[in-house]
């Protein structure tokens, strides 16, 4: 295979380790080979004194990384190989933890879609640079899963109930909104990205601070009062009731999302964010893996991926079908 066809391109020069996610037709979704290759590169560069920073990008111009390859994960389940899916997730979560533990700058240039696993390989690093074309989200409730890759550690520490809103609805943040929320650290206009990349590849980490533009309070800050009022209500039924009481277009849109995603995933996500507030990142990643063992075999994951990404009929048949039918006993069992 030509190296330029490899799913991960890893090079080093000028004291910089450069990683490029290279599955543009799959929006750079992470598969097992990519996770293993990233982990190998990180293992090599972590203790190499010649490497002063690591730069991560996505190839193709459309996406940084659209997430883990959940279609592949669903196929593993359908073929009766759920153990392979858990093995993949275990290695992915270990990579997330290794990025967080790195004592060197880990710089992600996010100029396009960044969701799920893409958040996982960026948010735990030191520098997350977004452009106005960046689109960030944790939309796992849409596919019957939960916000994993250690994102519960980040979501649970956002101001007020911002993490509950983003984790439950999968709301999308554009550009500087991701800095406001805490997923990103710096905003740089796309037109300034080539010069910034060149400076970073020359080992100039200070170029980020010189290039980044200030992010004043904007749309995310403006939503804080209603987000806190509704998504801080304390339980999924209480959140629904609070949104119904708002009688605004925004509240109705959020209600529609909550009625559309997996009811079971909503309850799992709400509980995991509650627990995450008392955990460190390794604890959150351990919770992710334990939950993955109980949630991925549950019907909603395979069904959610089928409806959104395989058959694309956007008509998932959830188990159970509504928020009102979710059993607290079922949710508690998933947490062991």
Regions of interest found by a model, annotated:
Residues 99-143, 165-166, 170, 175:
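Glycine-rich beta-to-alpha active-site loop
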Residues 58-94, 144:
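Glycine- (often His-adjacent) and acidic-residue-rich active-site loop
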Residues 148-205:
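Contiguous mid-protein beta-loop-alpha structural module that forms a pocket-lining wall or clamp
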Residues 56, 69, 121-122, 177-178, ...:
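Hydrophobic/aromatic residues within transmembrane alpha-helices
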Residues 243-249, 258, 262-336:
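Long, low-complexity C-terminal extensions of enzymes
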Residues 183-261:
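Amphipathic alpha-helical blocks and their helix-capping loop/short-beta junctions
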Residues 1-57, 97, 333:
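Conserved CoA-thioester-binding segment of acyl-CoA-metabolizing enzymes
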């Amino acid at each position: 295979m030509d190296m330029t066809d490899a799913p991960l391109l890893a090079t080093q020069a000028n004291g910089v380790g450069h990683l490029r996610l290279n599955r543009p037709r799959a929006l750079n979704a992470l598969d097992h080979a990519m996770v293993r290759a990233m982990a190998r590169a990180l293992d090599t560069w972590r203790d190499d004194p010649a490497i002063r920073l690591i730069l991560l990008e996505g190839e193709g111009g459309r996406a940084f990384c659209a997430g883990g390859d959940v279609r592949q994960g669903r196929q593993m389940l359908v073929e009766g190989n759920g153990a392979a899916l858990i093995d993949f997730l275990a290695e992915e979560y270990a990579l997330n933890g290794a990025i967080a533990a790195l004592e060197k700058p880990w710089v992600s240039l996010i100029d396009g879609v960044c969701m799920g696993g893409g958040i996982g390989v960026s948010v735990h690093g030191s520098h997350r640079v977004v452009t106005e074309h960046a689109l960030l989200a944790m939309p796992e409730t849409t596919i019957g899963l939960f916000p994993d890759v250690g994102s519960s550690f980040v979501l649970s520490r956002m101001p007020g109930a911002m993490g509950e809103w983003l984790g439950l609805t999968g709301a999308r943040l554009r550009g500087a909104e991701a800095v406001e929320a805490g997923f990103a650290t710096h905003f740089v206009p796309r037109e300034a990205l080539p010069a910034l990349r060149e400076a970073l590849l020359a080992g100039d980490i200070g170029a980020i601070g010189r290039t980044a533009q200030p992010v004043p309070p904007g749309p995310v800050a403006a939503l804080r009062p209603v987000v806190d009022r509704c998504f801080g209500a304390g339980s999924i039924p209480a959140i629904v009731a609070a949104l119904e009481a708002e009688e605004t277009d925004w509240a109705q849109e959020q209600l529609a999302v909550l009625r559309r995603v997996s009811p079971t995933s909503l309850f799992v996500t709400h509980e995991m964010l509650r627990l995450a507030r008392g955990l460190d990142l390794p604890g959150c990643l351990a919770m992710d893996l334990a939950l993955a063992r109980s949630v991925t075999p549950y019907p909603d994951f395979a069904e959610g991926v089928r409806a959104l990404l395989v058959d694309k009929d956007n008509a998932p048949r959830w188990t159970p079908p509504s928020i009102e039918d979710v059993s607290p006993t079922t949710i508690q069992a998933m947490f062991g």
